[in-house]
């Protein structure tokens, strides 16, 4: 498959080192690298001069920062200088998360800031490993406020070595992706470009036809009002939690953790999915049609089944007098719902559905087709399988497989962002104004049915292993008592189930949190597998010593079952023998461990990281328990 046309812009990696006094923050060092040469600055005006020079030398340039949201908070004054000089500034920011900021001097000279984490969502240490360019350790340890007061900022100082390496890693990684044709701002954008190009290839000549209308006929532009209405029926993955507390595996009742090999990719490959402009009707479609229904229903859980459905809209919970996020067992009032035909079938397996006779249902009926992206998936699967695990090519190919479906659900609502000086903040800030992208090329029904099939496939395994045996489910995995079921397909290829682990015990905590004990006695973090939303799982630079908030859970796994427990201490004492041993052997003090997590806070001049605690919570006040 020929890659999309390469972007002509010159690619750079950038990094900032910053300091703060607890109330305000400032730039200490700036490095912009093309992987071979580096440009150093120590203030806003210096960065502005460097960017101007690079634009005049190369025309259009793209500078990637790893975690642009953080760095952009310091670069706002630089952007403001260009803006005041009548340069055009266009910022793409979604939900306060910047995707890109483009500064245009004239038709042939521009700089675009992008976030390399949007293309490789890994920390910089992992990215360095992917390209064989290890991240260096800071010679100054942690960056406490005032850390830079003795820094040597002279041209040939060794104090530039650390930031140079970080900028080099970003530059080399992004340049490799651009050279291979992955030139969009995000991984999903890369996938979208490649998929559209693949659809436009002439099967006879094998060449891409930029004027081909096949994509538009398959995924036509939908009216914004229809998109908004159907969006009420778009939902993501499921999370189910039962048997909370500690459970031990036995020979008679083992514990099995199963995962699907690429859930969404398998749906794209094998399942019939909607295409084209839907036909509207008030009559129930035939069973073999794909449709979206607007219906009014009541639900009641069937005997022997587990409840899993949640209302997406807060008003539905209010009607029942429930907190938002409640798992539905039985409803006592009618609810107008937007549901795909796949979801209606899945619901009918677990719930008795009563339809309101006084409500006239409405349906959007779609044509359907399977395997539209078969060639795309096979291509990137082959790239992944031919690449060494952990390399940039392997990681990026995996992202190309997994990132395509979500782009279909991109909302037409967007933002116009202007950089203005706010007197109240004493700093520059982005002022957002909601607007509509009337020409959006997203096609929401495709994403609606992809996630609906994924939920159905997950619940198919739930029924196969027995509802009473289910411990935890999350999007594409099921943890349960007992062996794998022979009623679902197991294997190594796309869409089959595989054994992730067979733990000897599990601590089931609730919504997106559990700890599996893979073997006793516990002697290292490798003997444990953990999932806990909101709790970072970090190691020290050696990769041997766990640090931060999850230390409290490793130290006593039973804590993950304590809903409402607060994690995070400035001076935590480790109690478990195995974890104390690891700390002592690696030169750390197990009696004085900071387990707080760092949360960014915007201050005048930029961003500082504040220590914060975390409460273990199901993100719902009520959760069905057995």
Residue ranges and their predicted role:
Residues 2-11, 22-27, 31-67, 72-626:
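Conserved acidic
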Residues 15-20:
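Ser/Thr-glycine-rich phosphate-binding loops at phosphate-binding pockets of nucleotides
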